[in-house]
Amino acid sequence: MINNPKVDSVAEKPKAVTSKQSEQAASPEPTPAPPVSRNQYPITFNLTSTAPFHLHDRHRYLQEQDLYKCASRDSLSSLQQLAHTPNGSTRKKYIVEDQSPYSSENPVIVTSSYNHTVCTNYLRPRMQFTGYQISGYKRYQVTVNLKTVDLPKKDCTSLSPHLSGFLSIRGLTNQHPEISTYFEAYAVNHKELGFLSSSWKDEPVLNEFKATDQTDLEHWINFPSFRQLFLMSQKNGLNSTDDNGTTNAAKKLPPQQLPTTPSADAGNISRIFSQEKQFDNYLNERFIFMKWKEKFLVPDALLMEGVDGASYDGFYYIVHDQVTGNIQGFYYHQDAEKFQQLELVPSLKNKVESSDCSFEFA
């Protein structure tokens, strides 16, 4: 058993009442006072107005008006019901300029930035190319590893590099058996980035890729694919190519119409540029023309003096064959030997490895 003080206190109450009744019986009974009318001293409550209310009026008012019931659309119950309601036009957006699909009957498709760029069969991250750079009678082994590929789609513009990677060359100097550089590239899309440097925007990131228009013509004309591309435009658009990259239009041209030297046909190509056809989509063409620019040495990126006997101040004129995957280029710098040729082929083993892994960001 436990002691419960509540039971003792209840038991003592009747004794007190009994003693009080005995005292009242001994004393004379006083005359009771007349009852006071409720209307004389009403009980009032000040709610929302200054007018007094009776107690029963207040109770009835609370029942009728139901003050404590929240009927707002933003109440907890309404939001819980909204969460279980299927998508419909009656649902409102709670965020300004919200384009998420929950707020409308027809979901709005939000296009991400990565949908504006593409990779090709050979131009993709982790792809490797091997070959040589030829300077006079010397050949130097070259390896190119692509890291990022963001070729803009049709009607899309971007100042971000369309392609980046690492270029390694062996045997260029005796002091450094192998030199590696990080490079960035832009594709010629025939619109705001044309073959001529004068057509490129005046942006700091693009200035390193520019030369004079005459220099551009002298280098582009050395690519057979470039000559075929513009000469065929004058032959009713016969632009089909065979397996060797030769167009049917070029086959039908007399030999004297094919440019052979940069200096002889620079004026002719300049006139072709003035009447350059509007390419529908450069990605649909067999050949993709680019400019590659080496940015700094790796891993010694802080080596500002460079390497004795080597320079990366210039840039490459590049053409890529989307059918064979081959890359051909010419290095240009005003103080370097002209028309140093770059020849690269894709590594088939690396092509399989690069296609095994792909990522998409939502």
Swiss-Prot record:
Predominant location category? membrane
Keywords linked to the UniProt accession? Cytoplasmic vesicle, Isopeptide bond, Membrane, Phosphoprotein, Protein transport, Transport, Ubl conjugation, Ubl conjugation pathway
Protein origin, superkingdom: Eukaryota
Q: What is this protein called?
A: GID complex substrate-recognition subunit 4
Task: Give additional notes from the record.
Answer: Present with 6650 molecules/cell in log phase SD medium.
Note the site residues: Interaction with the N-terminal Pro (Pro/N-degron) of proteins that are targeted for degradation. Q133, E294, Y316
Q: How is it modified after translation?
A: Ubiquitinated by the GID complex, leading to subsequent proteasomal degradation.
